[in-house]
Swiss-Prot record:
Keywords attached to this entry: Cell projection, Cilium, Coiled coil, Cytoplasm, Cytoplasmic vesicle, Flagellum
Major location (coarse): other
Signal sequence range: none
Entry's localization field: Cell projection, Cilium, Flagellum; Cytoplasmic vesicle, Secretory vesicle, Acrosome; Cytoplasm
Tissue: Specifically expressed in testis (at protein level).
PANTHER family for the chain: CILIA- AND FLAGELLA-ASSOCIATED PROTEIN 119, COILED-COIL DOMAIN-CONTAINING PROTEIN 189
Compositional bias segments (type: Polar residues): 1-10, 49-58
InterPro entries according to UniProt: CLAMP (IPR032727)
Source organism per UniProt: Rattus norvegicus
GO CC annotation terms, alphabetical: acrosomal vesicle; axoneme; cytoplasm; radial spoke; sperm principal piece
Biased composition (Basic and acidic residues): 14-30
Annotated protein name in UniProt: Cilia- and flagella-associated protein 119
Coiled coil: 287-308
Biological process annotations from GO: gene expression; single fertilization; sperm flagellum assembly
């Protein structure tokens, strides 16, 4: 939860950063969809979803095995009023009398499908419909509601930009964009929200989106699979035996002469020690060496502690000698 003291410190920090930032665009780009962003992934496993979900999902995932796994840099914070929902869209949402009607208009504006077509679209629709309900409860104007929805969309884009954990970076980006709409410093920031409205909006986003941050990342990003390969130094490289192409002929020959092939197999196994045995002996030798060093170190520590203890006991066993008293004062 953001306190007024922390908000003041964040405000000063954002002001200093905005002084050195480039000039913002006065007319931001508008997009019909709130979450149509292409996200780059490397060799990852996609979530299980139907083909309809893959086509109608607002978040597009590019399957590029050579892409970089590191998270992309977050964009510079800027004013996002009328960025995605323009004045005509906000008037249509304002005319909606019921929640169901508002959800239908919102799904049409964002080009989202129903829950039966895509679960991701249903999650996005719930996210922004609850945000609109919160804005109505707080009495936000059309400009404030549009900016709040755009802020939430930019935060969602930053969340799904990578499958790795970036909650701290997303929170810093969220607070920076939030203060771009709370401080009058054109063209970098405007005083669109009051202090109480900023705190209320920050508490709402923290208690809703950031509380379920990992769930959003799990749904909208692919799962990452990590493959490890270990190589031991000082060992011979393993050579894979070629597979037998004619299995039927080999089984027939083994059935014909079982007694002749068994001694040959035993002799070959005795002559060529397996790589597993070599690895086991090497590991045992290294473990024994480390254990001997550890045992020697423990013995030295025990000897030192015994010597210190014996010295203390000897000092305690000595008789206590009183310091020599000064001679009596001479009689007058």
């Amino acid at each position: 939860m953001i306190t007024p003291r922390s908000s003041q410190s964040l405000e000063m920090k954002v002001q200093t950063e905005l002084e050195h930032s480039p000039k913002l665009q006065e007319e931001p780009d508008r997009s019909p969809s709130l979450v149509d962003s292409s996200v780059i992934r490397i060799g990852t496993d996609e979530q299980n979803e139907s083909p309809a979900e893959a086509t109608s999902s607002p978040v597009e995932v590019a399957e590029d095995p050579g892409a970089n796994l590191f998270p992309p840099p977050l964009p510079q914070p800027r004013i996002c009023m009328w960025k995605y929902l323009d004045i005509h869209s906000m008037h249509r949402l304002e005319k909606a009398a019921t929640v169901e009607e508002m959800r239908e208009v919102l799904a049409e504006l964002l080009e989202l499908g129903g829950p039966e077509q895509s679960l991701r679209d249903a999650i996005i629709l719930d996210l922004f419909s609850h945000a609109l309900i919160f804005c109505r409860q707080q009495g936000f104007s059309l400009e404030q509601t549009s900016a709040a929805c755009a802020l939430l969309q930019d935060l969602h884009k930053a969340c799904v930009a990578t499958p790795l954990g970036n909650v701290e970076e997303c929170y810093r980006y969220f607070t920076s964009v939030l203060f771009c709409h709370g401080v009058r410093r054109p063209p970098f920031s405007i005083d669109l929200f009051k202090e109480e409205q900023l705190l209320a909006l920050a508490d709402y986003v923290v208690n809703t989106y950031f509380r379920h941050f990992k769930l959003y990342k799990y749904v909208f990003t692919p799962q990452v699979r990590l493959d490890l390969s270990l190589s031991y130094m000082g060992l011979q490289s393993l050579h894979l035996w070629p597979e037998e192409k004619e299995d039927e002929e080999a089984t027939v020959e083994q059935a014909a002469t079982p007694q002749e092939e068994e001694p040959e197999a035993v002799t070959e196994a005795e002559q060529q020690p397996s790589e597993v045995c070599i690895l086991q002996t090497y590991i045992k030798c290294q473990l024994n060496k480390e254990l001997r060093q550890l045992q020697q170190l423990v013995e030295e520590r025990l000897k030192e502690s015994e010597e210190r203890l014996s010295n203390r006991l000897a000092a305690l066993e000595r008789p206590y000698q009183t310091p020599p008293s000064k001679g009596k004062s001479k009689a007058k």
